UniProtKB/Swiss-Prot annotation:
Protein name: 3-dehydroquinate synthase
GO biological process: amino acid biosynthetic process; aromatic amino acid family biosynthetic process; chorismate biosynthetic process
InterPro entries, A to Z: Dehydroquinate_synthase, DHQ_synth_AroB, DHQ_synth_fam, DHQS/DOIS_N, DHQS_C
Pathways involved: Metabolic intermediate biosynthesis; chorismate biosynthesis; chorismate from D-erythrose 4-phosphate and phosphoenolpyruvate: step 2/7
This protein's record includes keyword Acetylation: no
E.C. no: 4.2.3.4
Originating organism: Prochlorococcus marinus (strain MIT 9303)
Binding site for Zn(2+): E195, H260, H277
Length: 372
């Protein structure tokens, strides 16, 4: 991937009535995190607990701490395990322990430096420490940059399902340094591309077409810096617009769950960590695409376009061998169930989806049969 140089940061507002904030892309990146915190109104001199994992802390931890110190903050670094199988209340308790040792106060700050798992756990720890302190997201994976870090969803997994324990807790700032993708493993990059494709299907047909026109998508080295910036901007803008209009998933925000209903089943039944989150979402998008064809909501050509783009990104498209009745049982425990009815985000065309709560169990069985 080309070196990312962008002196002028791109600033995308998340226009919430009670606590608006910015998604900042580029600029000085992690070198400027201290300045960006001050711009966001976080007081100089406060204690800051930076939470990261070893793979991220090694190349970027000192850089982040130095920037915070230079701007007058008092940072401490906590390094945790960050696999999906570590996304548990026990791991959050470790963050709470570090917050206690650092004597964090209500005016203090937690900073998530890492991917989606670090962001989810740190956000939840901040939401529950002293009944809620501020959090800043510094995403270092593509998936976190375009999705997980934006919007305030935090939480951990339960043996019965993904993200069943959590809270809405909006960050004070999201700072995206695209240069951190230079050290991201290719598999993680591909997983993030699933969420980018999702935005194309649910509301940005032009983004979908842009991705279709790129010869190869499955490694970061295949994207020029200006193209990567465009992908990050369009994805962050898509997420921020939805969150700004529906912060707590009362309506429109549910479209962001496209591919996630089936995807969470795959993660739960295959075991957390077997698939990366983005990989499971990719499988889920193919599955719900098949469901949409069976319901005659969209045509086979569009379903095939989606499937081809997902495959081009190096993502899995095959449904795993799972007992259909176990799938149905797990779906019933999904947090998106409403009034006992299964809710799915169903595509009606590239760039358009509908939220449906009338999907029958027999339709799901038929869909799973077609996928097998």
């Amino acid at each position: 991937m080309s070196a990312f140089v962008n002196i002028d940061a791109q600033r995308i507002p998340v226009a919430l009535s009670h606590q608006p904030y910015e998604v900042v892309i580029g600029g000085e990146g992690l070198r400027g995190v201290g300045k960006e915190l001050r711009r966001a109104g976080l007081k100089e001199g406060i204690k800051v607990l930076v939470v990261s994992n070893a793979d991220v802390a090694e190349p970027y931890g000192d850089l982040c701490l130095q920037s915070l110190s230079d701007s007058g903050y008092r940072p401490t670094l906590l390094v945790i395990e960050a696999g999906e199988d570590q996304k548990t209340p026990v791991s959050v308790a470790l963050i709470h322990d570090a917050a206690y040792e650092a004597k964090l106060e209500r005016g203090s700050l937690m900073v998530a430096l890492g991917g989606g798992v670090v962001g989810d756990m740190t956000g939840f720890a901040a939401a529950t420490w002293l009944r809620g302190i501020s959090v800043v997201q510094l995403p270092t994976t593509l998936l976190a940059m375009v999705d997980a870090a934006i919007g305030g969803k935090t939480g951990v997994n339960h043996p019965g399902g993904k993200n069943l324990i959590g809270a809405f807790h909006q960050p004070r700032l999201v700072l995206i340094d695209p240069s951190t993708l230079n050290t991201l493993p290719e598999r993680e990059f591909r997983a993030g591309m699933a969420e980018v494709i999702k935005y194309g299907v649910i509301g940005d047909a032009a983004l979908f077409q842009l991705l279709e026109g790129i010869p190869e998508l499955n490694t970061p080295s295949q994207l020029h810096a200006d193209l990567l910036e465009k992908i990050l901007e369009r994805s962050a803008l898509a997420k921020s617009r939805v969150v700004s209009s529906d912060e707590r998933e009362g309506g429109l925000r549910a479209i962001l769950n496209y591919g996630h209903t089936f995807g969470h089943v795959v993660e739960t039944l295959c075991g957390y960590g077997t698939w990366l989150h983005g990989e499971a979402v990719a499988i889920g998008m193919v599955a719900v695409g098949e469901l949409a064809v069976l319901r005659q909501s969209w045509n086979r050509d569009d379903a095939n376009r989606q499937k081809s783009l997902i495959a081009k990104a190096g993502l899995p498209i095959a449904w795993p061998k799972l007992d259909p009745e176990e799938v149905l049982y797990t779906l019933q425990g999904d947090k998106k169930v409403k009034d006992g009815k299964l809710r799915f985000v169903i595509p009606t065309g590239i760039g358009n989806v509908e939220i449906k709560n009338d999907v029958s169990r027999e339709e799901i069985r038929k869909c799973l049969s077609e996928l097998s």
